[in-house]
Amino acid sequence: MVKLAFPRELRLLTPAHFTFVFQQPQRAGTPQITILGRLNSLGHPRIGLTVAKKNVKRAHERNRIKRLTRESFRLRQHELPPMDFVVVAKRGIADLDNRELSEALEKLWRRHCRLVRGS
């Protein structure tokens, strides 16, 4: 049975981890959200989130976006390539309801899988 946990090893924790992704990212995005990815040598995917107060004013909205993004990643972690991902929330993401945000994330995860297979 596949474990769908979200342990510490699946998170980008230090600024160096984020910088690694920002240096040479593969991008997949919508007007409200961008997912940057870069292959890692760990054999499993990791995720980091950036939801700026400038783009999403209310804390409960930022928390909702982060919670839904983590859940989407947790459920897809075994299908994703071994990459470090940084999810960047843009202006207007707070206007998406939970279903729309989940669908957008699913679409972007699939796009990243295709990008890796294509290269």
From Swiss-Prot:
It comes from the Bacteria. Keywords: Endonuclease, Hydrolase, Nuclease, RNA-binding, tRNA processing. GO terms for cellular component: ribonuclease P complex. Transmembrane segments: none annotated. Its EC number is 3.1.26.5. It catalyses: Endonucleolytic cleavage of RNA, removing 5'-extranucleotides from tRNA precursor. GO terms for biological process: tRNA 5'-leader removal. InterPro entries: Ribosomal_Su5_D2-typ_SF, Ribsml_uS5_D2-typ_fold_subgr, RNase_P, RNase_P_CS. One of its GO terms (molecular function) is ribonuclease P activity. It is an enzyme of class 3 (hydrolase). It holds the Pfam family Ribonuclease_P. Consists of a catalytic RNA component (M1 or rnpB) and a protein subunit. Belongs to the RnpA family. RNaseP catalyzes the removal of the 5'-leader sequence from pre-tRNA to produce the mature 5'-terminus. It can also cleave other RNA substrates such as 4.5S RNA. The protein component plays an auxiliary but essential role in vivo by binding to the 5'-leader sequence and broadening the substrate specificity of the ribozyme. This is Ribonuclease P protein component.
